[in-house]
């Protein structure tokens, strides 16, 4: 009995050791071949089976073989769950595919637009670089060509610069003298008139062979009307001389003594002279350009003459439209010139004493004080001079008039009428 008990304890210890070793190696491993069926079978080791109740008799007969235990439900339930899981996977896959496809389409369109914009910007940059490279290579020739043109037309360019400089100087001087009002210098005004006259006569004398003075009276100058540059030259000189003539009229207005003409009336004369001068400058180049458009060489056919007449008629239509626009401005100027201009009402002595007896503009005693709608008092000449360029009160910015006559300050338009 002692020997049998020792033998049983030894056998139990060996089986326990082997069970621990098998347990570390995961005794319940599914067989790969069994995954192809509807169920799942596990392979149990003999040692694990020996510990199970009721397995004592079978353990002695099948000691060296594994036991397979099927796990899972019936084939119907297994197929149902498999189909359900497959449908869920298919639905989720289709949803993710659709969502991913929409996002991919948006990303593709955005990337296409960005690629197009980047391509356009790169092409424009490359064109700009090509242009700069071409200018860099052609710069020496451009300088040589400009030098040749300057030498060839040195006299004409010098006259053009002189006429423009004279115009800017006299125009600024006239505005300064108008602003000075009573403090203007008659000697300086006379000098401006003499300077304008001498400049005009010098130009006519220098180019006396072309008879440019005839263009002032819409007559034909002795120039080649087939040459575009000569016609353009005649138009430019005529325009500057006309500006000088009307600026001379403004100098004559400046020389009129103050008792004979008020400042407000002077401003109306300046405005009328400028409007008439601009209208005359629009009409003056018409004969020159008309003859240039209808002129033809002996080699030209009747088609060339017909085309020239058609172009001349189109030019006349354009000039008539321009004159129609200027006629409205001239009518407004004439109405302003012949209508009395009143700014405010005469101020009472009490209002003058309350204001302090000093004009806020000229900082001197009031001369013909006028009270505005805002109850501020100014000299009549001072407020008239202010309202030539502004519409509001100098102190409170209340709107006094809705008209601004910009030519009342003696300025002359710098626009060069070349057509």
UniProtKB/Swiss-Prot annotation:
Keywords: Endoplasmic reticulum, Membrane, Metal-binding, Transferase, Transmembrane, Transmembrane helix, Ubl conjugation pathway, Zinc, Zinc-finger. It catalyses: S-ubiquitinyl-[E2 ubiquitin-conjugating enzyme]-L-cysteine + [acceptor protein]-L-lysine = [E2 ubiquitin-conjugating enzyme]-L-cysteine + N(6)-ubiquitinyl-[acceptor protein]-L-lysine. The keyword Cell inner membrane does not apply. GO terms for cellular component: endoplasmic reticulum; endoplasmic reticulum membrane. Gene3D superfamilies: Zinc/RING finger domain, C3HC4 (zinc finger) (3.30.40.10). The keyword Transmembrane helix applies. SMART domains: RING. Pfam families: zf-RING_2. It is an enzyme of class 2 (transferase). Residues 352-403 are annotated as: Required for ubiquitin ligase activity and for protection against ER stress-induced cell death. It is found in: Endoplasmic reticulum membrane. GO terms for molecular function: ubiquitin protein ligase activity; zinc ion binding. Pathway: Protein modification; protein ubiquitination. Residues 1-120 are annotated as: Disordered. Its EC number is 2.3.2.27. A zinc finger (RING-type) spans 359-397. PROSITE patterns: ZF_RING_1 (PS00518), ZF_RING_2 (PS50089). One of its GO terms (biological process) is protein ubiquitination. E3 ubiquitin-protein ligase that acts in the endoplasmic reticulum (ER)-associated degradation (ERAD) pathway, which targets misfolded proteins that accumulate in the endoplasmic reticulum (ER) for ubiquitination and subsequent proteasome-mediated degradation. Protects cells from ER stress-induced apoptosis. This is E3 ubiquitin-protein ligase RNFT1. The gene is rnft1.
